[in-house]
């Protein structure tokens, strides 16, 4: 299980409660932990570009339909809840989620929102 991998997760809480694809967010350096931090996908087409990142299906990522990564729903689940390997995010999508997580957590300024002086 590596950062950027797309896997299935089922049996988590709230938004990861039903089986759905997730991307592994946690750095590979922390693979000895019993849990893993993930970001779930949804097929809901809500347009919220700062925290719902559109990802189109392709051969590398293994997604079957257009999805959105729910950056506002990052969660940590037990590794025992992580299922099948689906694919892997493209490098460009990994960079997009990196930036989106930083902005959502307030660790970086959004390129789309003007900061007040």
Indicate residue ranges for each PLM-predicted region.
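Conserved functional hotspots at enzyme active or ligand-binding sites that engage polyanionic ligands
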Residues: 1-117
